[in-house]
From Swiss-Prot:
Keywords: Chloroplast, Plastid, Ribonucleoprotein, Ribosomal protein, RNA-binding, rRNA-binding. Its main location: plastid. It is found in: Plastid, Chloroplast. GO terms for biological process: translation. GO terms for cellular component: chloroplast; ribonucleoprotein complex; ribosome. Part of the 30S ribosomal subunit. Pfam families: Ribosomal_S11. One of its GO terms (molecular function) is rRNA binding. This is Small ribosomal subunit protein uS11c. Disulfide bonds: none annotated. The gene is rps11. Belongs to the universal ribosomal protein uS11 family.
Length: 129
């Protein structure tokens, strides 16, 4: 029996002007997700998906490249302004926000939503190198 050819659908341009940018910055990687106001994902990128491997994923430069990549995809979807929600203690927090501004997306709000424990779980021990 002949194999059927899959038809790929081109992504339709959604004219969504406002959005929310979620930046999760860990010590090992940085993830950027741009959603509409309901929370549906328009574009996403990470340092690992941008071609960085190993310890280079945790660098500010990798976060900058990932943010630019996600922002370009979101601009194609019609995003013009966004709120930024930053989560995590990583190195790529500020550089990801600056990269978003450099692409031309207007940032209306920057909010840090990193969960802070009221003396909950014991943190990992300090590294001795």
């Amino acid at each position: 029996m002949a194999r059927q050819i899959r038809k790929t659908h081109a992504k339709q341009k959604k004219n969504i002007i406002n959005g929310i940018t979620h930046i999760k910055s860990t010590f090992n990687n940085t993830l950027i997700t741009i959603t509409d106001l309901k929370g549906s994902t328009l574009s996403w990128s990470s340092a690992g998906a941008s071609g960085f491997k190993g310890t280079k994923k945790g660098t500010p430069f990798a976060a900058q490249i990932a943010a630019e990549k996600a922002a370009k995809q979101a601009i194609e979807q019609g995003i013009r302004q966004t709120e930024v929600l930053v989560n995590g203690p990583g190195a790529g927090r500020e550089t990801a926000i600056r990269a978003l501004q450099a692409t031309g997306i207007n940032i209306t709000l920057i909010k840090d939503i990193t969960p802070i424990p009221h003396n909950g779980c014991r943190p990992p021990k300090k590294r001795r190198v």
